[in-house]
From Swiss-Prot:
Residues 1-234 are annotated as: Alpha N-terminal domain (alpha-NTD). It catalyses: RNA(n) + a ribonucleoside 5'-triphosphate = RNA(n+1) + diphosphate. GO terms for biological process: DNA-templated transcription. Its EC number is 2.7.7.6. This is DNA-directed RNA polymerase subunit alpha. Keywords: DNA-directed RNA polymerase, Nucleotidyltransferase, Transcription, Transferase. It comes from Cellvibrio japonicus (strain Ueda107). SMART domains: RPOLD (SM00662). Pfam families: RNA_pol_A_bac, RNA_pol_A_CTD, RNA_pol_L. Residues 248-328 are annotated as: Alpha C-terminal domain (alpha-CTD).
Length: 328
């Protein structure tokens, strides 16, 4: 099996070309035929939908009750402002969520750089335009930043009791993935006399919160961790849970001699291998009457003695005989 695995080519060359600070071209070769699309598609899906990042998920704008409002002295309506807020590239260090403020008096352009941040938060695209103030209006807002993965629509964060949510807290559809665009192609590669090999080319662009090369490295790590479980399909052998023996009434473990039956009745029971009270109560009247030398008088005696102890014939016991009797 190991020999068959070793026969596969593994990539020997990887070339990373930086096109811009947020865009890179990665070439990986040689790959066995078909593996270009196999790896390319897997990495693409992880990079676009499974990468963790930060995004603005909620906004409170002074004087705005809902997203269909307009702000006097601001060129954009509220929906446009919310769309622009989704384009802010933000990084948080050591936090899962935080609240930032923005305050800008016009006239002028409101950019991501106007957001007031603390030492744990970075805005990677400070020139990103959020709104344009055309008058002397002052635009104030509170922005909630959260950490997440992939794409999260606003509806998925709303609580069941939406009516209790404060008016004016506007929810944003959040795209946490730091990858803005990814395309891959598979070209032909050659190694010595083999010409049927693949070359994988990845063209990746991020929002600036992560280096393109680091993004690919993280995606490959995620893929590796998910596939590692298949390397050994046996996994850890789970031992069968020990079945705890149900507690048995101690009186059932006592010998039939303790019932102080007549010698005739006691001997008849022992002849039928009935040694314990637990053995006896599981027999029916019909079964006992078939016992040699045990008549109705002896049967009545047995029933009366059992009744005095709260027992009767024909009872059913689970897990009988118990292990303690089997080992005797």
């Amino acid at each position: 099996m190991q020999t068959a695995v070793n026969e596969f080519l593994t990539p020997r060359h990887i070339d990373v070309s930086e096109i811009t600070p947020t865009r890179a071209r990665v070439v990986l070769e040689p790959l066995e035929r078909g593996f270009g699309h196999t790896l390319g598609n897997a990495l693409r899906r992880i990079l676009l939908s499974s990468m963790a990042g930060c995004a603005i998920v909620e906004a409170e704008i002074d004087g705005v009750l809902h997203e269909y409002s307009a702000i006097e002295g601001v060129r954009e309506d509220v929906i446009e402002i919310l769309l622009n807020l989704k384009g802010v590239a933000v990084v948080m260090h050591g936090k899962d969520s935080t609240v930032l403020t923005l305050s800008k008096k016009g006239p002028g352009v409101v950019t991501a750089g106007d957001i007031q941040v603390d030492h744990d938060v970075e805005i990677k695209n400070p020139d990103h335009v959020i709104a344009n103030i055309t008058g002397n209006t002052e635009l104030k807002m509170r922005l909630t930043i959260a950490r997440g993965r992939g794409y999260q629509p606003a509806d998925s964060r709303r609580r069941d009791d939406d009516e209790s949510r404060a008016i004016g807290r506007l929810q944003l559809d959040a795209s946490f993935s730091p990858v803005k665009r990814l395309a891959y192609s598979v070209e032909s590669a050659r190694v010595e006399q083999r010409t049927d090999l693949d070359k994988l080319v990845l063209d990746l662009e991020t929002n600036g919160t992560i280096d393109p090369e680091e993004a690919i490295r993280r995606a490959a790590t995620i893929l590796q961790q998910q596939l590692a479980v298949f390397v050994d399909l046996e996994g850890e052998k789970q031992s069968a849970p020990e079945q705890k023996e149900e507690a048995i009434d101690p009186i059932l473990l006592r010998p039939v001699d303790d019932l102080e039956l007549t010698v005739r009745s006691a001997n008849c029971l022992k002849a039928e291998n009935i040694y314990y009270i637990g053995d006896l109560i599981q027999r029916t009247e019909v079964e006992l009457l078939k016992t040699p030398n045990l008549g109705k008088k002896s049967l009545t005696e047995i029933k009366d003695v059992l009744a005095s102890r709260g027992l009767s014939l024909g009872m059913r016991l689970e897990n009988w005989p118990p292990a303690s009797l089997k080992n005797d």
